[in-house]
């Protein structure tokens, strides 16, 4: 189960929070979901090069607040905040509602699974070898303090005629452990050979109750790097 399901959805209410935070009524539920989708799709496309890792949508009775977490917030804000005002007006026109936009900096961009997946996808589109792109992202996550990372790419890798899946794993990524803080990201690389899917799982440690310590017998010593494996 843990191997198949989205690890973020599996941990909602345990150690992850929802990215859409509002209480719907039956009358407004479809409209609110549609608006959230439009806002996220627009901002992801418009701010792609700003390194957006997360978009939070909060609603109150009269206000809609959008929080954008990005690795390069300066691109979004612009000189003297001019760009963010233009962005707010564009999103307001999109959903016909008054919107407040907050920008937060992603302090540990190397340990963000979504940014790592987009980084690999961008390199694949630039014709970088997929193994080199995967190893580079793994090294960046380890430097940022990740306890484990798994990167998987699937498609016509290197222009091969038959599609296949290959992945690298460094450290531990316990997908079945619900208290484990697993970050997950997905991106697609649009190449001349077709689309290549990129998935990234990053293990950031375990969330334990107060007064409980992690198992001291657990082996935390560094292990030899594992070779790339081909999926079935």
Curated annotation (Swiss-Prot):
Regions of compositional bias (Basic and acidic residues) in chain numbering: 213-222
Functional description taken from the UniProt entry: Binds the lower part of the 30S subunit head. Binds mRNA in the 70S ribosome, positioning it for translation.
InterPro entries: KH_dom, KH_dom-like_a/b, KH_dom_type_2, KH_sf_prok-type, Ribosomal_S3_C_sf, Ribosomal_uS3_bac-typ, Ribosomal_uS3_C, Ribosomal_uS3_CS
Matching Gene3D superfamilies: 3.30.300.20, Ribosomal protein S3, C-terminal domain
Record keywords: Ribonucleoprotein, Ribosomal protein, RNA-binding, rRNA-binding
Oligomer and partners: Part of the 30S ribosomal subunit. Forms a tight complex with proteins S10 and S14.
Family label: Belongs to the universal ribosomal protein uS3 family.
Composition bias, Basic residues: 223-232
Family matches, as HAMAP family: Ribosomal_uS3_B
GO biological process, one term: translation
Organism, scientific name: Campylobacter fetus subsp. fetus (strain 82-40)
Region of interest (Disordered), ranges: 213-232
Record domain KH type-2: where: 39-107
Keyword Amino-acid biosynthesis included in the entry's annotation: no
Protein name: Small ribosomal subunit protein uS3
PANTHER family referenced in this protein's UniProt entry, alphabetically: 30S/40S RIBOSOMAL PROTEIN S3 (PTHR11760), SMALL RIBOSOMAL SUBUNIT PROTEIN US3C (PTHR11760:SF19)
A Pfam family recorded for this sequence: Ribosomal_S3_C
One Gene Ontology cellular component: cytosolic small ribosomal subunit
GO MF terms held by the record: mRNA binding; rRNA binding; structural constituent of ribosome
Biological classification of the source: Bacteria, Pseudomonadati, Campylobacterota, Epsilonproteobacteria, Campylobacterales
